[in-house]
Amino acid sequence: MRVSKYLLSTQKETPANAEVISHQLMLRAGMIRRNASGLYSYLPTGLRVLRKVEAIVREEMNKAGAIEILMPMVQPADLWVETGRWEKFGPELLRFKDRHNRDFVLGPTHEEVITDLIRKEVSSYKQLPLNLYQIQTKFRDEVRPRFGMMRSREFLMKDAYSFHLDVDTMNETYEAMYNAYSNILTRMGLAFRPVLADTGSIGGSMSHEFHVLAQSGEDLIAYSTGSDYAANIEKAESPVPTEPRGAATEELCLVDTPNAKTIAELVEQFDLDITKTVKTLIVVGASEATPLVALIVRGDHELNEVKADKLDLVASPVEMAPEALIRDAIGAGPGSLGPIGLNIPIVIDHSVSVMSDFAAGANVDDKHYFGINWERDLPLAQVADIRNVVEGEPTPDGSGIYAMARGIEVGHIFQLGTNYSKSMNATVLDENGKSQVLLMGCYGVGVSRIVAAAIEQNFDDRGIIWPEAIAPFSVGILPMNMHKSHRVTDIAEQLYKDLNEAGIDVLLDDRKERPGVMFADMELIGIPHTVVIGDRNIDAGVFEYKNRRTGEKQDIPFDQLLDFLKNAVKG
């Protein structure tokens, strides 16, 4: 490709409304342009990267035995009513009517459509297992689209759905998809971690997320220093204490604490060990019989709302109770709450169950109890894992301790079981002629999100540093004063021809531009390998080569350059 015939829409200045580096660089490098909130057009450079990501995804899905199809972006609302998600999904589901007043949605996902398709097309166990995928545009009406392609309203996604009659083949397909996703990200040259994950609104049992590691990642990943164990912070299991509860050494004491509204203030004013304090959080209960539930974690720990959401007593999704409701029921406000004398159900974290001589609110404003001990001052409450893990704690596999990293979720695989097939009556006849509800798996990759995540992991102060496999161009040719030197022109054109014939994506900057502008554009758009051609190089019989990632420069003799670049591009 010649720059003179190409839409290279680079920008020097960082757009003011771009919050994260991938958004900034995708705009500056001329990859995307905003059309409306959360809606973007891909310019040539951006589309080249997107298509390379898409091609790798497609190749690995095909190798794993999945079959490509294409489903409509517009979906009939009847299917969503059938699964109950018409009401559950919320305002992210864009709903509209056609000219005949029939309800439709703009698809954020395709479980309903694929299940409807399979129940009509598959009738016998002999047709199973089956794994179908598509690469299709999705739309989610995010309340606040932000971060460019990281959280846009319209995005490109690969979603696959598998159908089974037995758990064994579902597990086999799940493992195949796990390996395919690992291969996809490995081929793209990205540092990533698969992590155990919560199934969220899609539902199901087994679930893994695939995270591209980046300091800007929204998700916190807890992983073992001694094994492959890793989990989203929402899913990471807290260790169950192995040491017995310490004996009581203090008397229960009611203390005035007028200026201690938070754990931090309580600890500072009374010189307490924070691990000897607890936080009492009041959430909405699951029934009229239990309108409020108290959740108690140690003072230095944080409540994990995903874990709390799974408690039978707690309403889903978890909702903190309003202060007025708390005061009506308990007689005190947040900051003065604790387990003694509490007239609502209590669930405590494992770490709280082994505490002794601890401090908590007294359920009277501006008062706390010090020296609280279980089974002396109050009965032991229901115990569950309801907190986030912290760095340095032992991991559940016993092979190491927790460390933390930030990641950007780009893939998610689920075992859905019968969540959708049962509600939509997707059944087949087994080998005995009996009707069986299909088991399902669901496997998603954010194709456009991978592009942004790759930038978040690969950039410097000059621009993007693309991994080889997804770079828009592999080689950039920079002829110095091309329009003034026939020698430079001839050699640049010959190299351009040779690289094209070798199947290497090459960009020839044939503009009448200053060298500084040409260098800056090549570095901004992240071309991995650049070759500089000038009269001085020609006189010396060498090309000047520069590696974008390492910054290494070297002179390559004319007769060696083509082989050198072929090897460099192959990695």
Curated annotation (Swiss-Prot):
Keyword line: Aminoacyl-tRNA synthetase, ATP-binding, Cytoplasm, Ligase, Nucleotide-binding, Protein biosynthesis
Origin: domain of life: Bacteria
InterPro entries: aa-tRNA-synt_IIb, aa-tRNA-synth_II, aa-tRNA-synth_II/BPL/LPL, Anticodon-bd, Anticodon-bd_dom_sf, Pro-tRNA-ligase_IIa, Pro-tRNA-synth_IIa_bac-type, Pro-tRNA-Synthase_IIa_type1
Its biological purpose: Catalyzes the attachment of proline to tRNA(Pro) in a two-step reaction: proline is first activated by ATP to form Pro-AMP and then transferred to the acceptor end of tRNA(Pro). As ProRS can inadvertently accommodate and process non-cognate amino acids such as alanine and cysteine, to avoid such errors it has two additional distinct editing activities against alanine. One activity is designated as 'pretransfer' editing and involves the tRNA(Pro)-independent hydrolysis of activated Ala-AMP.
Aminoacyl-tRNA synthetase in keyword set: yes
EC number(s) from the headed UniProt entry: 6.1.1.15
Oligomer and partners: Homodimer.
Annotated catalysed reactions: tRNA(Pro) + L-proline + ATP = L-prolyl-tRNA(Pro) + AMP + diphosphate
Keyword Transcription among record annotations: no
Swiss-Prot/TrEMBL GO biological process terms: prolyl-tRNA aminoacylation
Comment text on domains: Consists of three domains: the N-terminal catalytic domain, the editing domain and the C-terminal anticodon-binding domain.
Protein family membership: Belongs to the class-II aminoacyl-tRNA synthetase family. ProS type 1 subfamily.
CDD domains documented for this protein: ProRS-INS, ProRS_anticodon_short, ProRS_core_prok
NCBIfam families, per database record: PRK09194.1, proS_fam_II
GO molecular function: aminoacyl-tRNA deacylase activity; ATP binding; proline-tRNA ligase activity
HAMAP family the UniProt entry points to: Pro_tRNA_synth_type1 (MF_01569)
Protein name: Proline--tRNA ligase
One Gene Ontology cellular component: cytosol
Subcellular location: Cytoplasm
